[in-house]
Amino acid sequence: MKNYPVVIIGGGASGLMLSSLLPSSSLLIEKMNQCGLKILITGNGQANITHDEEPREFITHYFDKKSFVSHAVYSFPPQKIREYFREKGVETTVRTDGRIFPSSFRSRDILSALMKTNGEIITGTPVLRVKKDGNLFITETEKESFSSPVLVIATGGRTYQKTGSTGDGYTFASSLGHTIITPRPALSPIRINCDTTPVEGISVPSVTLTLGKKEITDSIVFTRNGFSGPTAENISHWIDGKTELTVSFLESFEAQKIKEENGKGSVINTLSKLTSLPHSLLEFLFPFLRNKNNASVTREEMRKIEDTLLSWRVTADTSRTEDKAMVTKGGVDTSEINSRTFESKLVPGLYFTGELIDVDGECGGYNLSFAFASAFLAAEDIRKRI
């Protein structure tokens, strides 16, 4: 059995960041044949690594985990993340919406920078189990076992499983006594109770989705069975099972304006002109208007038009979206983790970083930022003990 001062399980964003910040005596074990597969698809392959905001604003994008992430974000804010990558040879750029990317807009450049580590990396090696033996952790793989006084579990969540995020870390954490908050998809496409194939691929730049008291406005893209895009993905955090969702395409609209247009004109064409919504989307929403002219629209039809454009009610859920969701909500209970060091409060020498923890952020680089920041604090604490 080989002994290392530190063993890291997981070669994703947080595991690689941690490895790069530790001495060369550390060992990182990755189950896939290549590290960082999920990094490569982040931000549509462009790697939105963080967001240009001050920490006090930044932490508001983590839903109910603002307090838990605060020290990490203040310790390793966006500016320090940019400096880290600059030192690794990767310049970054701020988009007009505040999202920060490598200047090349190539996620592979981010992965290459993270791979510049002095630590040892083993790939293609799934971990079977972990256990505590006195003051040491034993990490068992099919071929061999490793012992270490410090163990970091950085295996990610349970989404995009083809990248290796299959939820193994939950089993490891649970076997060491930790509570797992039920994992489910977040930053996920939303499925709705109607076939949206006819409008698949149509993008609407500003739509408001309302779920109870939660309201988010941004763009959406229609999929075969619902929506994706920032608005859908951000509100998916609160969807648990089948839930009524209200879709508002416009802030206000008076259907009576149709009657002010040429009476012989097509209602669909008129609506597209008045609302700036795509013709094909309006045909999908109002099939009963396809062959009607403006003059023939009834009072009841005008009411339906207003109701649908201002508050289209659908039944939404995020089931069966694990392979499309970008992150996982749920994971290791934050109440059992020291938010200043990311060490377990239950098991000395055990650390958790990144998406494995019950923390998820909004779209815009917040999840990668947390992966990096949690690794930064864990590395600071680990260096003091090895």
Please report, for each region that a protein language model flagged, where it lies by residue:
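An anion/pyrophosphate-binding glycine-rich loop and adjacent beta-alpha core
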Residues: 33-35, 40-41, 49-51, 55-58, ...
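Short hydrophobic core segments
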Residues: 7-9, 29, 127, 146-162, ...
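Glycine-rich loop(s) and the adjacent beta-strand/alpha-helix scaffold that form part
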Residues: 150-196
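Glycine-rich FAD pyrophosphate-binding loop
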Residues: 7-9, 23-44
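Conserved N-terminal/central alpha/beta ligand/cofactor-binding core
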Residues: 33-120
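A glycine-rich dinucleotide-binding beta-alpha-beta segment and adjacent secondary-structure elements
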Residues: 123, 283-360
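Beta1/beta-strand and adjacent pyrophosphate-binding region of the FAD-binding site
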Residues: 2-12
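A conserved short coil-to-beta-strand element within the FAD-binding core of flavoproteins
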Residues: 123-136
